[in-house]
Amino acid sequence: MRPFALSAAVFAATALSQNKGEKTKCADGLYMIAVRGTGEDKGSGRIGEIAEDVSKRVNGSIVSPLDYPATLQDPDYFDSEEAGVKALSAALDGYHSSCPNGKIAVFGYSQGGQVATDVFCGGSDNKPLTMSLVKDSVVAVIAFGDPSHVANLTYDRGTSKNDGIFERPSNETKLCEDNYSDIIRSYCDTGDVYCDVGKNNETHGSYFEKYGKEVVDFVVERYEKALKDESTSTQTSTAAATATAETSGSATASDAPSATTAAPGNAAAGLVPGLVLAMIPLALAVSEYL
């Protein structure tokens, strides 16, 4: 990966300054970031249509297009992709800070797929997101036709057996395989010019129709699982806290002295009058023989 060039840095700074001061709206459902592919018009692109399909099944969801160049030239691909990485990292950090209980899904196509995987796995001179943020908030990461695709990973889907034109190094794939294989799905089919180094130009645009429904089902399933796990965790924590409080209360009660129990000194003193009374009949009986 090339060093971050001035043009991309300026773009990223401009995008961030535009968003600075804007109040983030927290989604009642999923907050989905769509990262369009190279050459697509500004907006969420074709990958955004998949996100919109998810929103139809998850009420209260928001689809947010990532603002980045998505260009091949001016700025060139590498600068554009790095600007996307910076912008996506900032968007995820910002949403998590504003909506700590919110759930996020990321969708990336082509160059956008590389942007997404760079953010989570590391790449483009970028440190990956903190693991705690991902575990807390991110339920799914979808990539279609990622040029940095590496074949035969646990989160790969599709028919490709080859690495992409910008093959990702093993240390980055290991990070994602070890920690995020349950939330990432990277689709690449045989023949794709960019993710499979193939010769079929049509393959690169075929994922939407071919895998769209599968992706929607996966994202919805991951979202529902996250909510269920969160609910179970909350119930377990509440039950544990209640049990601790009850145990503490019982221990306090058992440790307190009984109101009906006399102090040792008083009990001994109470025996003296009783003994004296018991001795009177005996003394009278003895006196008769004297």
Write out the residue ranges for each language-model feature.
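N-terminal signal peptide
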Residues: V10-D28, A285-L290
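Active-site catalytic motif of lipid deacylating hydrolases and related acyltransferases
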Residues: E22-N101, R185-G212, V216, E221, ...
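Active-site nucleophile loop of the alpha/beta-hydrolase fold
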Residues: V138-H149
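Cleavable C-terminal sorting propeptides in eukaryotic secreted/cell-surface proteins
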Residues: P264-L290
